[in-house]
From Swiss-Prot:
This is Pancreatic polypeptide prohormone. Residues 77-126 are annotated as: Disordered. The gene is PPY. PROSITE patterns: PANCREATIC_HORMONE_1 (PS00265), PANCREATIC_HORMONE_2 (PS50276). GO terms for cellular component: extracellular space. The keyword Signal applies. One of its GO terms (molecular function) is neuropeptide hormone activity.
Length: 126
């Protein structure tokens, strides 16, 4: 009975620690506004703290953070082929679609060099 009670207390303590630890690792707290009657030195210190706070929140994140959303969960990305419209790309406005597998005027193929689709005019079948 005492072993069960000890295990339950350890489980409760572990759960509380697990719930409280992420709060300590979260975003920094916003600096407290010193008030309208603050001295110029206090306002300068507040401005510096606010600048650090904003820089911390808006800094670019590289590596693992770039692969996760705001909650720390992995971001599931669909491939371009699974996106609406498939992997087909159309030429930008004003550029004709290339024919024969080469780009315009014999240059290497571009991403929009493709097989005909609904967006391009197809020969009518009579």
């Amino acid at each position: 009975m005492t072993a069960t009670r000890c295990c339950l207390w350890l489980l409760l303590l572990g759960t509380c620690m697990a719930l409280l630890l992420p709060e300590a690792w979260g975003a920094p707290l916003e600096p407290v506004y010193p008030g309208d009657d603050a001295t110029p030195q206090q306002m300068a210190q507040y401005a510096a703290e606010m600048r650090r706070y904003i820089n911390m929140l808006t800094r670019p994140r590289y590596g693992k953070s770039a692969e996760e959303d705001a909650l720390g969960l992995p971001v599931w990305r669909q491939s371009h082929a699974a996106a609406p419209g498939g992997s087909h790309r159309h030429p930008p406005a004003g550029l004709p679609a290339a024919k024969g597998g080469t780009g315009v005027s014999g240059s290497p193929p571009k991403p929009w060099d493709c097989l005909p689709c609904r967006a391009h005019s197809l020969p009518s079948q009579s």
